[in-house]
């Protein structure tokens, strides 16, 4: 097993060298006069150097970081020493805030390259990657994008040097995915703003500063009237109340923060907060998908190595067909996740730097699918790795137990898999209602519509697409029959009327995600023909998954929605009494 997490990862190198359209990324990021070959060579050298450090220094500390966990002494919360040492090395390499502009001390790297670095870190130790991404990268990116020149000069160089660590505080005890319920307030007093409220589940919350989402327009509600604010902790300006005791990413402090008269400065203008935080959330969801790839890669490599060494019944266990099937499923998950996620990362660069409107629409379509597939896939890959290891899989020295534990947070934070499903299906239904005729053709997805039928791979992907479109047609038909043809003319519907779609959103998302993975691997196989068997395997899986989900929707007996209606009525009676 190579200790260079870039050059030693054949699938990642193949994607970098032969699949990712770097010339488009370079032109978008650095302008049409730049030299793509020279720029990409520089990026490759950075990743190779980082991959060597991560493989030789960060990965060996992972078990110890997990064992020690967060340090809680004398009322303070801090990272443990192995974690600190790993992050110190990254800062010394100039990789604390690799996406921040070079003129502010950052690496000036595009989103795609930054995500490759994130994947390697997550493979080595997910907790360390969380601290790096949320503690340094995210605050710097938000301040660069929305802060004043003064705020940029004050904070970004210090974040980029690793002198301070920040966080992004959005979640509250009563406001998780339902952001509009937050109650933390910001009140203008002279030249500054005063924050009051509580935040919970804040990754890297032990740092020296934090970006806070708060309500700053009096009388506003929901997602209106929010703002983002920068607060420093120095002098007790806010309190790190505690770090949660958790069984996932144990080395990363997940903190509760208390703001009582906290002085802060605003990023941008009052009322811009939701628009601003949405950019962070969408990029973070792609980032969490990338985390899933790193964890799945680690689990897959351990399983492959063990299956080649462990002999049972006279042969290595990888030669037993059921074990081989598990290993091939893991390979498909990892390569499929990686191919789809970096397609989305490239689109993000084209949309963000190149102002490409079609890329923006495409990455919006892919983002919830990447978050869903890569994180659910990571859990599945870790579960398979545990099974391949048998009894020793639950022994700490084999690491797969840590991978399994850490993977479980991935489908939860930055929007659960179910929230991603609602997002994906909401946009899909908008597209269908704009163009109902798409349901008698190749469907509303432009990317899925370009699948060619000239081979078995294409036929399987087309069948999966047809199953997904048929599922949409079935669900929409139920709603039309119950509520009238006005639905197709944009009539507003209640949550109760949308029940069939809300119930089956995750099934539909699973079908769409698998179909997109098969499509992306098929397009990759055109560039790298050796990848055709892998793409065909993914296409067969997509066809089977979409058929299963279509049947599940067809056989729905309505009992779940009946139960929901009963609980809704019970709540209504309780509220009236």
What are these regions, as identified by a protein language model?
Residues 1-129, 154, 158, 558-576:
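Amphipathic, small/basic residue-rich leader segments at the start of a protein or domain
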Residues 2-31, 138, 392-462, 543-577:
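Glycine-rich phosphate/cofactor-binding loops in nucleotide/flavin-utilizing enzymes
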Residues 51, 80-153, 157, 161, ...:
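Internal helix-loop-helix
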Residues 83, 135-136, 147, 152-184, ...:
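Internal maturation/activation junctions in enzymes
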Residues 192, 196-238:
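A short core secondary-structure module
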Residues 234-241, 246, 253-284, 301-319, ...:
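A glycine-rich, basic-preceded beta-loop-alpha segment at the flavin cofactor/substrate interface
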Residues 335-371, 386-389, 491-502, 522-529, ...:
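C-terminal helix-coil-helix/basic helical segment that borders enzyme active sites and/or dimer interfaces
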Residues 450-577:
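C-terminal amphipathic alpha-helical interaction region
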């Amino acid at each position: 097993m190579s200790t260079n997490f870039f050059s030693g990862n054949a699938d990642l190198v193949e994607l970098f060298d032969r699949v990712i359209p770097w010339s488009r990324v370079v032109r978008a990021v650095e302008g049409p006069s730049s030299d793509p070959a020279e720029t990409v060579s520089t990026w490759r050298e950075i990743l190779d150097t980082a991959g060597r450090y991560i493989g030789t220094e960060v990965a060996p500390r992972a078990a110890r970081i997990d064992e020690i966990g967060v340090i809680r002494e004398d009322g303070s919360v801090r990272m443990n020493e192995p974690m600190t040492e790993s992050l110190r090395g990254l800062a010394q390499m100039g990789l604390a805030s690799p996406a921040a502009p070079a003129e502010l001390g950052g690496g000036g790297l595009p989103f795609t390259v930054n995500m490759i670095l994130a994947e390697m870190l997550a493979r080595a130790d997910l907790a360390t990657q969380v601290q790096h991404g949320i503690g340094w990268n995210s605050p710097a990116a938000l301040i660069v994008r929305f802060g004043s020149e003064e705020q940029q000069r004050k904070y970004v160089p210090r974040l980029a040097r690793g002198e301070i660590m920040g966080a992004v505080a959005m979640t509250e005890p009563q406001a998780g995915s339902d952001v509009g319920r937050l109650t933390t307030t910001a009140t203008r007093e002279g030249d500054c703003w005063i924050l009051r409220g509580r935040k919970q589940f804040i990754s890297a919350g032990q740092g020296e500063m934090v970006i806070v989402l708060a309500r700053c327009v009096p009388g506003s509600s929901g997602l209106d009237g929010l703002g983002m604010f920068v607060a420093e902790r120095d002098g007790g300006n806010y309190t790190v109340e505690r770090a949660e005791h958790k069984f996932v990413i144990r080395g990363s402090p997940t903190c509760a923060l208390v703001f009582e008269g906290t002085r802060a400065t605003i990023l941008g203008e009052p009322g811009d907060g939701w628009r601003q935080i949405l950019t962070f959330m969408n990029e973070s969801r792609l980032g969490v998908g990338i985390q899933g790839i790193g964890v799945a890669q680690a689990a897959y490599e351990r399983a492959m190595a063990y299956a080649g060494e462990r002999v049972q019944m006279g042969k290595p266990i990888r030669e037993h067909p059921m074990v081989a099937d598990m290993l091939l499923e893991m390979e498909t998950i990892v390569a499929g996740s990686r191919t789809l996620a970096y397609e989305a990362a490239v689109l993000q660069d084209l949309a963000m730097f190149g102002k490409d409107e079609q890329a923006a629409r495409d990455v919006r379509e892919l983002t919830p699918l990447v978050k869903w597939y890569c994180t659910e896939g990571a859990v599945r890959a870790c579960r398979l790795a545990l099974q391949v290891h048998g009894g020793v899989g639950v022994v700490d020295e084999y690491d797969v137990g840590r991978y399994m534990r850490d993977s479980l947070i991935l489908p939860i934070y930055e929007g659960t898999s179910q929230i991603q499903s609602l997002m994906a299906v909401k946009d899909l239904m908008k597209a269908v209602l704009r163009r109902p005729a798409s349901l008698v053709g190749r469907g509303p997805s432009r990317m899925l519509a370009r699948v060619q039928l000239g081979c078995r791979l294409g036929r399987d992907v087309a069948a999966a697409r047809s199953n997904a479109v048929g599922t949409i047609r079935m669900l929409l038909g139920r709603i039309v029959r119950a509520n009238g043809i006005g639905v197709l003319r944009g009539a507003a519907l209640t949550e109760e009327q949308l029940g069939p779609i809300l119930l089956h959103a995750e099934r539909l998302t699973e079908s769409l995600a698998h179909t997109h993975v098969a499509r992306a691997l098929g397009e990759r196989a055109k560039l790298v023909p050796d990848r055709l068997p892998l793409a065909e395997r993914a296409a067969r899986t997509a066809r089977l998954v979409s058929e299963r989900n279509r049947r599940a929707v067809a056989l729905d007996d309505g009992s779940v929605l009946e139960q929901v209606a009963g609980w809704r009525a019970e709540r209504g009676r309780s509220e009236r009494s």
